[in-house]
Structure formats: structure tokens, C-alpha cells
Amino acid sequence: MKRNRSASSTAVKPAQLKAQGAPPQVGVGQPYSVEYYYKVQWGHQEEFLQLFLKNHYPVLEKIRGTGRILALKIETPAYHTTEDGRWDYRVTIRYKDSTVATTANPDEEAFKKELWPDQATFAQEEQRRFEILLAHWDLPVMEITPGK
């Protein structure tokens, strides 16, 4: 026997779309952390890391010097995972606040020109870094460890 359901009983209600137990948002002026994940073509992990350290890390360090970045950490997994969950490098940046994290740095282009006067080589190496990159994603994170 076929049951006929009304649209109202099977439709998703707006209240059901709200996040269940969503974490609180970071307060205004509070530090804000983002994890940046990089998945590289097999066999090119070392090349990617060398290019990242040569052409991207120095600008992050310059930005840290301005106070926009409070902490910077680069990690790689100690063990292998499944291919669909694999990532090769995670860069965690703790920004001064969420506004700094989500707006363009007005000094970044000047830093790049200062650090790499040969812009043609810089552009070529950055292009190569992205050619060997399979995936990249950003994950804002919040610490929720209870206080003592």
C-alpha cells in the first residue's frame, strides 16, 4: 500500500537547518586561528615544501612582524592516512583577530616585492607550487578546552 505524505510532513523545516550545538563565535578583538591544509601530488611533497618555505613562509614572517599574525606553525602527519583524508602539510596561523584573518593585508604586495626583487622568478616558482598542489582548504578553528 502506497502512503501519500503531504509536503509539509516531508519538507525540511528552517528550524532543522540550524547547526546543532554550534560552537560560540570568537569575541571581537580576540585571537582567531585558521588551519590551512595542503595536499600535494605524490612524489612532490619535498618540492612543494621547499617552494613554500622559499616563497610563502617569508611573507608570513613579515606579516607576523607587523602584529597581524601572533603565531605560526607548520606540521606534517607522522603516519599515512587514507587517500581521501590525506593532507601533507598543515599551517596553523593564529591571527590578532577575525577581522585581520579575513581581510587582505595592505602590505603583502610590498613585502613580496621587497623579498623577491626578481618577480618573474617568484611568479614562476609560485606557479609551480600550485601546479603540484592537488587540494588546499582553510579551516577556522576555535579552542574550546574548559578553563581550570
Residue ranges, per PLM feature:
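Short, solvent-exposed mixed-charge patches
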Residues: 1, 147-148
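Sec-dependent N-terminal signal peptides of Gram-negative exported proteins
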Residues: 1-21
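An amphipathic, aromatic/His-enriched active-site/gating alpha helix that lines ligand/cofactor pockets
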Residues: 21-23, 27, 62-70, 84-86, ...
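Acidic/histidine-rich, surface-exposed loop or edge segments in extracytoplasmic proteins
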Residues: 28-43
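Polar/charged side chains located within well-ordered beta-strands of beta-rich proteins
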Residues: 35-36, 56, 91, 129
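Short amphipathic alpha-helical segments
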Residues: 44-71
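A cross-kingdom feature marking solvent-exposed beta-strand/loop segments within repeated
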Residues: 77-79
